[in-house]
A protein has these predicted regions:
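Conserved MFS/SLC helix-loop-helix module at the cytosolic interface between two early adjacent transmembrane helices
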Residues: 70-109, 299
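Hydrophobic core of transmembrane alpha-helices in multi-pass small-molecule transporters
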Residues: 98, 110-126, 249, 331-345
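Cytoplasmic helix-loop-helix junction between adjacent transmembrane helices
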Residues: 115-152
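Interfacial helix-cap and linker-helix signal at transmembrane-aqueous boundaries
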Residues: 46-47, 78-79, 160-172, 267-268, ...
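Helix-loop-helix hairpin linking two adjacent transmembrane segments in secondary transporters
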Residues: 150-203
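Extracytoplasmic
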Residues: 17-54, 71-75, 162, 257-264
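Extracytoplasmic gate region of multi-pass secondary transporters
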Residues: 39-46, 233-295, 381
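C-terminal transmembrane helical hairpin of 12-TM major facilitator-type secondary transporters
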Residues: 276, 282-288, 294-353
Length: 432
């Protein structure tokens, strides 16, 4: 009822309801980014409180990313089966349980359950599939820009809440650092429940930029798993799927996996405190916000393969630079700006290519598999970097390896540009 009333008001103002959905997703991603950032803020307080090794916590974060990778392909078809709102509410419930159990943990295996399973399942179900689904369903025009805006909320969450969580760990019990994630999740759940809609047709609207109302199939045969695997069966025959999946694996390896989880401990190894290190992540988050929206704008106007090749190459350079920096204010500020502009700039062109190749319904589902590869890369880096640190007493080899992996991704896109493969942009059948 409230959504219909708001839609009537917006119609009078000449504003499409799609922008309301984009705003809600932005706020939800803002809140979930706080939850996703909690392990990297809590890794040092937990190890100091219980005398554990960094690898004891990083194995939990590695499991979290692994679970995310395994469940990403299920998120979009689950939204198709039970609705976006229901999926969001399930995710919020799991995040609340995961955060509470993390701060109450006193055995190592507790973290495997709270961080690894609860937060991992929540992240897997929602992933970036929510942004891809809403952008694909609600926007025909400006889709790349909208994806950039919605995914940039992850950076905005870091900018706003990570320094707050770090500050809480120093002035009060570190357990209270989860408060921003809990409060934000509850607020966003209420917004989705009151204002969220699955399809524009539920409000008798076409997608933004379209002139015809799209009515989805009233019933989709099969469960979420069968829908997901059926979409995958068609996608794996397309060369674009393998290129996007491999490079997105490298994206996860070199962003959320190593930097997202190990930048603060790396700084601690070089005598940079947790608050100062989180401030650099916040600065990185600000420029990530700018970079991701800029990437969305660029992806609507320029060759997406060229953009992705450039993004990965620049990221590789920044990862190779970090170990050689002096870890002083100037060096880390420069790095945070440079890396922040590129942190998740790969998402808008990747989402757009998925929609172009695989269609309005199958596109978000296939992107779920591609994002699963991303999170698998994150899992490898999250655990592998921590293990490498414990064995070698330094993070330097891990960052070098991540930097060179980015160059592999760049070479893949250069290959595509050089040999001009005849990839059709006609979406395959939307049949489920």
């Amino acid at each position: 009822m409230l959504a219909e009333q708001l839609k009537t008001y917006l119609d009078k103002a000449g504003i499409h309801y799609a922008w309301v959905m984009a705003a809600i997703v932005f706020m939800f991603t803002l809140a979930t980014s706080t939850t996703a950032s909690a392990p990297q803020i809590l890794i040092l307080p937990i190890t100091e409180a219980y005398g554990w090794d960094i690898s004891d916590v990083s194995i939990a974060t590695g499991l979290m990313y692994f679970m995310t990778a395994m469940l990403c392909p299920i998120g979009a078809p689950l939204m198709l089966r039970i609705g976006v709102i229901n999926v969001v509410l399930i995710v919020i419930f799991l995040e609340v349980i995961g955060l509470l159990c993390t701060v109450l943990a006193f055995e190592k295996w507790h973290l495997l359950v709270s961080i690894g399973l609860c937060l991992g399942i929540a992240s897997g179900i929602i992933g970036l599939g929510l942004s891809a689904t809403v952008a694909t369903r609600w926007f025909t025009a400006r889709r790349g820009l909208v994806v950039g805006i919605m995914t940039s909320a992850f950076a905005a969450g870091q900018l706003i809440f990570m320094p707050v969580m770090a500050w809480i760990t120093t002035v009060s019990n570190w357990q209270f650092a989860i408060a921003p994630g809990l409060i934000g999740g509850i607020i966003c759940g209420a917004l989705f429940f009151l204002l969220g809609k699955d399809w524009p047709s539920q409000l008798s609207l076409p997608a933004y930029g379209d002139d015809k109302i799209y009515y989805p199939p009233e019933e989709n045969t099969g469960n979420a798993v069968s829908i997901s695997f059926k979409a995958l069966a068609g996608a794996i025959k397309h060369p674009a799927f393998w290129i996007l999946a491999i490079t997105f694996f490298i994206c996860g390896l070199t962003s959320t996996g190593i930097v997202g989880q190990h930048f603060i401990p790396f700084c601690a190894d070089n005598n940079v405190g947790i608050i100062m290190a989180s401030s650099y992540l916040a600065l990185m988050g600000f420029f990530n916000f700018v970079g991701t929206m800029g990437s969305g704008w660029l992806s609507d106007r320029y060759n997406n393969y060229t953009l992705l090749g450039l993004y990965y190459g620049l990221r590789g350079l920044s990862l190779l630079y970090l170990p050689y920096s002096n870890f002083d204010v100037y060096s880390l500020t420069l790095w945070a700006i440079f890396f922040g502009l590129d942190f998740i700039a790969t998402v808008p062109p990747t989402v757009k290519l998925s929609g172009q190749f695989f269609g309005m319904i199958n596109g978000p589902i296939v992107f779920g598999w591609i994002f699963g590869a991303h999170q698998l890369g994150s899992a490898v880096a999250a655990y592998g970097s921590g293990l490498s640190r414990d064995i070698l007493s330094t993070y330097v080899p891990a960052f070098f390896l991540a930097g060179f992996a980015c160059f592999v991704a760049t070479v893949l896109f250069v290959y595509l540009l050089t040999f001009k493969p005849k990839f059709s942009i006609n979406a395959p059948s939307e049949a489920l």
